[in-house]
Amino acid sequence: MDNMNHEELNDQLLVRREKLHNLREQGIDPFGKRFERTNATNELLSLYGEFSKEELEEKEISVSIAGRIMTKRGKGKAGFAHIQDLHGQVQIYVRKDAVGDEEYELFKTADLGDLVGIEGKVFKTNVGELSVKATGFTLLTKSLRPLPDKYHGLKDVEQRYRQRYLDLITSMESRETFVTRSKIIREMRRYLDDNGYLEVETPMMHAIAGGASARPFITHHNALDMELYMRIAIELHLKRLIVGGLEKVYEIGRVFRNEGVSTRHNPEFTMIELYEAYADYKDIMKLTENMVAHIAKQVLGTTTIQYGDYEINLEPEWTRLHMVDAIKEHSGADFWNPMSVEEARELAKEHNVEIKDTMEVGHIINEFFEQKVEDKLIQPTFIYGHPVEISPLAKKNDEDPRFTDRFELFIVAREHANAFTELNDPIDQKERFEAQLKEREQGNDEAHMMDDDYIEALEYGMPPTGGLGIGIDRLVMLLTNAPSIRDVLLFPAMRHKQD
């Protein structure tokens, strides 16, 4: 911002402070009291929008509304303004002879951004705009800072994220996104509750970071003098509840991963995890597609949505594709025949797939998938049959134990869900954890830690179980056509602001 803009802003701040002082001198509270509304702006339009000008004059409908002044015009003894609430805007018409000298003076000196209450009669202007003719004008909150230019809004994307309150004031689209987010979560809860799932709450601070391959945030508990990890997944506590006999459970909550920030990643994000006893990953596939389709229908009214340049069909049944078949289809590489790690490395070299020296065959298969397949999965696709090496908590496939009964859901080339038939063999689980410990020793700081308490829980017996995790932020991105995760988080993680 140049010096001129600084000076203009400072002048505006001074003028508004002076108005604040004058209000107090007159005995008017610039940060007022409770105001009772009869209607929101959208209710006025739905209730009275169809009436003619003459019908409204005859009915003399009295209303009480409140909101923020977004536009204002007029001279002399009358003026117009638009006030905005959560749901939209409505025009008000203020005449000196209708509200009195004192209240008209309040209207005249009001600034854009001030919050006001209006009592009045509903009418239509000569051009047919539904409006409220004020009989009372109340200042509810004096705004001491000018709003961004109404014609341009917040063009600085970073400012939109840092000052979300300004973004919400100036962008109806942004407000609608966050209202939709709330509806998505509400419908998700409703669907699961109606299908017999029990919502639970489990700790966010763990003695051992587990349930996912990710770097944790570490904190220190002073009273207990111990290090704790902010949870990287909800999984292991929910599976303990399955052991305890809570047969269908879910939790919607925050998860924390000490990793990079991008259009798809935020260090803290919201997940739903659910677990169902006596089910497997195929049951969870059906649950996933039916639940997402239900949410889209209830919130958006359709299962056909637009995301960027793509039209996405969320109507079940979705494509199911084994990871090895997907790799063969898109790269020609065939991993169905067992091979040594040397052969897998040679295959990676032939197909220009980047790998690390420490990778086993399963890791190389996964790299093939991520580098050759993932960005081609636009329509909803369940990729199943992940290698054991990258799935330490999933049950091995009975027919080919190199792979697991696990799936990931991809839509618009992004992972949206991860699920498996849960590993309930405590001996196998301990061996998997030990293999993960070796990976940690080789430098993989995302490998799983040993969790003896969880193994002990499994030793009491966990029934065959299907489990699912869905990143709610990415689902909201999909259903609101948002290009970045920051567009669906009210207050995303940001770097320190540079002076």
Swiss-Prot record:
CDD domains noted in UniProt: LysRS_core, LysRS_N
Residues that coordinate or bind Mg(2+) 1: 408, 415
Known cofactor(s): Mg(2+)
Binding site for Mg(2+) 2: 415
PROSITE patterns linked: AA_TRNA_LIGASE_II (PS50862)
UniProt catalytic activity: tRNA(Lys) + L-lysine + ATP = L-lysyl-tRNA(Lys) + AMP + diphosphate
EC numbers: 6.1.1.6
GO biological process: lysyl-tRNA aminoacylation
GO MF: ATP binding; catalytic activity, acting on a protein; lysine-tRNA ligase activity; magnesium ion binding; transferase activity; tRNA binding
Coiled-coil intervals, chain numbering: none
Compartment list: Cytoplasm
Gene Ontology cellular-component terms listed: cytosol
Family annotation (Pfam families): tRNA-synt_2, tRNA_anti-codon
InterPro entries registered for this protein in UniProt: Aa-tRNA-synt_II, aa-tRNA-synth_II, aa-tRNA-synth_II/BPL/LPL, Lys-tRNA-ligase_II, Lys-tRNA-ligase_II_bac/euk, Lys-tRNA-ligase_II_N, Lys-tRNA-synth_II_C, NA-bd_OB-fold
Co-factor binding comment: Binds 3 Mg(2+) ions per subunit.
Gene3D superfamilies from the UniProt entry: Bira Bifunctional Protein, Domain 2, Nucleic acid-binding proteins
Entry keyword set: Aminoacyl-tRNA synthetase, ATP-binding, Cytoplasm, Ligase, Magnesium, Metal-binding, Nucleotide-binding, Protein biosynthesis
Family per similarity comment: Belongs to the class-II aminoacyl-tRNA synthetase family.
Description of how the protein assembles with itself and partners: Homodimer.
Protein name: Lysine--tRNA ligase
Organism from which the protein derives: Bacillus cereus (strain AH187)
